[in-house]
Amino acid sequence: MISADTNVFVYLFDPRDSSKNETAKTVVAAMRTRQSSVGLQVVGEIQSALRRRLRLPVGLATQQARDVLTQFSTFAYGESAVETALAEAGAERLSYWDALLLAAADAVGVKAMISEDMGDGRRFRGLEVINPFGPSGPSDRVIRLLGL
C-alpha cells in the first residue's frame, strides 16, 4: 500500500513551482489507480497548509481537504502510534507529527510514504520514504514505485 504526506497534496494547488505542481498532479493521479491510503492527519494538515501557506479562502481549502478524504481510503492513529511518535521525537530522530504519520501508516501496512521532507530512502519499520520530486519532474524512485 502507498501513502503520501501533506506536502504532495499542497503542491497540487501551488502554482509557484510548476515542476512540483505537475509532479504532484502525476503522483496523486497514479495513487488514485493503485492501492493507496491517506492518513486522516494529512487531511487536516492539507486544510491548514492551504490556508496558512497558500492563503486559500477557508471554504476552498476545506473543500480540497474534503476531496482528498472522499477520493482515498484513510487511516487514523491509535495509542501505539502515539507512543512510537513520542519515542521517536524524544530521541530527536523525527518530528512528533512525522513520526506519528509514519507509525500510523506502518500499522496499517503502508510500504511506501511519498514525501518531500522526511528523508528520501529513510526506513521506518516496514515502510520506506520516497521523495517524489526530481530535478525536472518525478524522481526516478517514484517513477519506479508508481510505474509512471
Where are the language model's segments positioned?
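Short, well-structured N-terminal submotif of metal-dependent ribonuclease cores
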Residues: 1-38, 53-60, 136-142, 147-148
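Alpha-helix capping/helix-boundary segments
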Residues: 8, 42, 81, 100-101, ...
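Substrate-recognition element of Asp-dependent hydrolases with the DxDx(T/V) motif
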Residues: 36-43, 115
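Amphipathic alpha-helical interaction segments
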Residues: 41, 45-48, 63, 84, ...
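Active-site-proximal, substrate-binding regions of enzyme catalytic domains
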Residues: 45-73
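Active-site neighborhoods of divalent-metal-dependent phosphate/nucleic-acid chemistry enzymes
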Residues: 71-116, 146
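Acidic, PIN/NYN-like endoribonuclease modules and their adjacent C-terminal/linker elements
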Residues: 102, 107-148
